[in-house]
């Protein structure tokens, strides 16, 4: 799975500021669901975002608010994001964003 080059740069900067991400990048996380490929952390098969990632809002906006998405409801927005990304509180963030 690939991501936009600008998003990738931002993701790597965010990883460098997050203790868990730094540990995952050097192989110190024992949970077998996490893996690193080309400096990107994956949880299962989704790109892992840190707790304070600024990419969350960009992803929510791109998935729910873009003209091509037609303001999908919660379920479609959640599923679309969950296919590619993983972060703690994803479901709650999607619910909040869809309600706004």
Per-region residue spans from a language model:
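Amphipathic alpha-helical
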Residues: 77-100
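A general alpha-helix detector
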Residues: 59-62, 76-80
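Flexible, low-complexity interdomain linkers flanking nucleic-acid-processing modules
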Residues: 1-68
């Amino acid at each position: 799975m690939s991501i936009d080059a600008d998003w990738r740069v931002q993701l790597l900067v965010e990883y460098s500021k997050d203790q868990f991400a730094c540990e995952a990048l050097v192989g110190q996380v024992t949970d077998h669901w996490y893996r690193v490929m080309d400096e990107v952390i994956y949880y299962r098969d989704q790109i892992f975002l840190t707790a304070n990632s600024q990419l969350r809002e960009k992803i929510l906006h791109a998935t729910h608010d873009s003209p091509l998405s037609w303001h999908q409801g919660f379920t479609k927005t959640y599923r679309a994001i969950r296919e590619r990304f993983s972060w703690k509180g994803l479901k709650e963030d999607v619910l909040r964003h869809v309600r706004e």
